[in-house]
Amino acid sequence: MYTSKQPFLKSKQPFRKSKQTFNKSKQTFRKSKQTFRKFKQPFRKSKQPFRRRPRIGPGDRIDYRNMSLINRFISEQGKILSRRINRLTLKQQRLITLAIKQARILSFLPFRNYENEKQFQAQSISIITGSRPRKNRHIPQLTEKYNSNRNLRNYNQNLRNINRNLSSD
């Protein structure tokens, strides 16, 4: 009989973890790490020669009157290009945007480039309409077919009604 006052007996054999599973997982991790290192090295080498020169030189002054500089940072539609595209520092981008806005207000620059914007809109509209199938409801052949189907349905409905009336009489 078991009573609550009896002490808990420890087993004589200690609890052992299986070391094999742990070692296997370690080995697979090492293998994957080695293959990752192999692929990592050639990418580092290829990036070095593609370093580009910044668009703003050391002598360039960021000002609303410097139109040749400002025009480099405006898109074809007249929008201010992002920092990622311009490759500018945050301070330079802020100064450029302020200069562009100032030039627009003082009418040195248009707010939008309407000629390029119209071409852009025409291209985007043609792309949208080209991908979607159009529904032409006003083609005479389709409307005749639709009307004939509707007439057939109405005729069948009338026949059913007549049959009901006859059966009830």
Swiss-Prot record:
Its main location: plastid. Gene3D superfamilies: Ribosomal protein S18. Transmembrane segments: none annotated. The keyword Secreted does not apply. GO terms for biological process: translation. Residues 27-55 have a biased composition (Basic residues). GO terms for cellular component: chloroplast; mitochondrial small ribosomal subunit. Residues 1-61 are annotated as: Disordered. One of its GO terms (molecular function) is structural constituent of ribosome. It is found in: Plastid, Chloroplast. Pfam families: Ribosomal_S18 (PF01084). PROSITE patterns: RIBOSOMAL_S18. NCBIfam families: S18. HAMAP family: Ribosomal_bS18. This is Small ribosomal subunit protein bS18c. It comes from Agrostis stolonifera (Creeping bentgrass).
